[in-house]
Amino acid sequence: MELLSWGEIIIRILMQLMPVWISLVVLFALSILYKRRLGLYGKLFDSTIGMIGFAIVMFWVFAGFYAGALDLILTHDPLSQVSGMKNKVPGTPMRGAEENEYSYFLLGGDTLARDVFSRMIAGSTVVIVIAPLATLFAFMAGITLGLPAGYYGGRLDTALSFAANLILAFPVILLFYLLVTPEIRLTGMPQYMAAVLFAFPLIFCTVLINSRLYIVPQKRNIVLSGVLFVLLMLYISLINEDGSKITLFNAIDLFNVDGGLLTVFVSVVFVNSPTVFRIVRGLAMDIKTRDYVAAAQTRGEGPWYIMLWEILPNARGPLIVDFCLRIGYTTILLGTLGFFGLGLEPESPNWGATINEGRKLLSIYPHPALAPSF
């Protein structure tokens, strides 16, 4: 077999990503067709720039899903090393490829003879798992603390604002260096932080349901029991880790989370939560002076009902924008951490680690570093 030309490489990559293209076409067709019924999401498709940005985001979401969950678009195992493929240029054929094995390294091989294309696509699975979930957890923590701080004010606001400013004043990279050092990880600090931070979704869902259904106690109790049971199972599974300081109810531990992944996840939530807190606090301080809040107070509604069902819905615009932006910031942060070798395993196909490995021979073999950079 001969080396593929760049035209053949591009065509093969486009064909390999066919499930992604089909998903994008279906998503956009349905979204444009029903955009008038989709509220704020539908308005996105009135903007050309908005659609382009959304397409780029959803491309990597679908790529990560099909690569990680369904294993449809990867040409090779992103961790396996293939003899004779070290630093090979894009389009190099594999020697002795089996019948059911893809016969080319579409974007070449890296310094450890691993497929660059497969590692680039597999790296997106790390991003689509950590970035949205970490941002969601950070928002739940920030909202749970920011609403009462802005609504009540006083000493509670002073104490929480001081803690938030203290965290924000700490250098982010230095914080990550501290959390991933073996000595700190042996103390169980990441697990203790996870136990605290992951409790906020439980608190948020509890007060959300209770404030809405408090007038129908029987229905409230049923809904709360079901939701809290599921969340508690997830909570226990997230904070438990083999060999860690925290081992709660190992018999009902549904899944194991890699220690490096948990450290990165907790660190991202910890860094983002204070910023979300400050945004929510400022919005709550502004909105609590509105007439509809005074009307709710006159009706005798409780504080948490007012905060969650009067103030929070009217603050959704800035929060949605910040949520989307923060996912992008988190993606960049994950790449930075991977580049410095913090948290995730060295052989992980995350984009930052791949770029770091490829830069060492950038002048001779640029393709391993350039592919994940784009």
Model-derived features: where do they sit?
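Gly/Trp-centered helix-boundary motif
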Residues: 1-139, 143, 147-148, 158, ...
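Alpha-helical transmembrane segments of integral membrane proteins
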Residues: 114-374
